[in-house]
Amino acid sequence: MKTRNLIATSSLALTMMLGIVATPLSAQQTYTPGVTVEKNTNPEWEADYTATFIYKDKDARDATNVSVSGGFQFYKPEEVQSFANTGDGANIPCYNAYQYQGGMFAGGYNLNGDAANYSMTEIEDEIFEVTIPLPANEYFYAFNIEYSDGSSETNVKDPANPALANDGSDAGWSLFYVGNGETKGQEYINPRTDGKTGTYSFVNYLAEDGTTQPLGIYLPNGYDANKTYKTIYVSHGGGGNEVEWMTIGAVPNIMDNLIADSLTKEAIVVTMDNTYFNWDYDRIINNLFNNILPYIETHYNVSKEVNDRAFCGLSMGSMTTTTLYQTHPDQFGYFGCFSGANVPVDVSKVAHLDQPNLYITAGCIDMALMNDSYNTASDRTTTGFVDKLNTLNLTNYKLEILNGAHDWYVWRESFTNFVKDHLWTKDVKIETPSETPVIKPETPASSTNTTTAPKTGDDLNLAVAGLFIIISVTTGVVIKKHY
């Protein structure tokens, strides 16, 4: 709340007259906007760390209330077991950060639709603060602001910790790390500090409709243009972009850690923007084979062997992955399908479905595990996809149900497991086709616009126990740590 400043023409005399000792400006409390992570010293909180958020409002309006929200919801594994059978989360308890207990897992949202919102205290004029306990992980957050004139702003990214962006596209939230990888499934997400790190950048290529589109490129530590590398192609979900996997998805950190610890082989990782194609799978696949792969194979020294390249994705990116698997199973040695599936063709008539390895995941309270499309012609669920594989007696897959929801906690763990435990394991060499297929979609929509991403994350409409929920989950970067 803004206050009027009164000017004292004789402040020293007034101070002496009232018997008050003036405090030098250098000794006054200062507040640094952003997030500060520290070890937890409050015995009433069970989490190992605390995160203190400080927001300084610079808007001309008078801020009266500020809160912070993000991936600060938690669940008990023993209380969510019914979801796998029913897809109903209406009666599953969700806990806030102050209620956190060891053994709980983080979720990006409340299954009942009301995300935890943490009110902040105004500690100085237009400066707001709150401290919450948190276990180790990577978290996303944003501020919600109410003004005295009745107006408000929601999901405001932290101006002191902006999300990394590429030409206007970003992960939609601010991001920070807590701890040192102590949380199961998130052991490899933190940045390395020993210099054994690769690089990532964003480049432009010519897409199938003639427009310039972006790619994210991760190169491993010590990248050598004269050395041949394996490749991992990775797709975001609905409303996302090429930036997300490189930031909230922590792909560079995961790859750095797994490579440095000799838990995987060196590989180049390529992210893309499939939102631009409005999830027209024919166009996406056409663009992949005729534009993205040729660009990568021209500009980087990568193997063209089928068993040296993989494709994976989350949610609608997983639907892209399963579509690609069912239409071109002989073009990649490995597919990672995280939280979603699509069955666009009669798979019983597709050859070579037993050729690649599949790693399939979903969260234990994931909308894509089982929802109202299960066992229907429009089934998009993980459960439905696995059932279809079983009807064909296919055994070249592994299914894992992970602790989490339809969110980045599950997807980071999925990518980690995919790279660490499932890639580059095939001993039998698959003969590489003489040339990659040229797929021509039916009358592709013309466009001369470059990519724009007004939304980020994975925006899906779903019905859960009769409640209509819109979920948008994503993130952004770290600030300070004191241990």
Which functions belong to the PLM regions below?
Residues 46, 50-137, 146-179:
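Aromatic-rich carbohydrate-binding modules that target alpha-glucans
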Residues 209-222:
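A short loop-to-beta-strand scaffold at the N-terminal edge of the catalytic core in hydrolase folds
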Residues 223-279:
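Short substrate-entry loop that stabilizes the transition state in hydrolases
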Residues 278-301:
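Alpha/beta-hydrolase active-site loop
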Residues 298, 304-354:
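Primarily recognizes the serine-hydrolase "nucleophile elbow" in alpha/beta-hydrolase
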Residues 361, 367, 379-433:
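C-terminal catalytic histidine-bearing segment of alpha/beta-hydrolase fold enzymes
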Residues 428-456:
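C-terminal low-complexity, Ser/Thr- and acidic/Pro-rich disordered "stalk" regions positioned immediately N-terminal
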Residues 460-481:
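A cross-kingdom C-terminal cell-surface attachment/processing module
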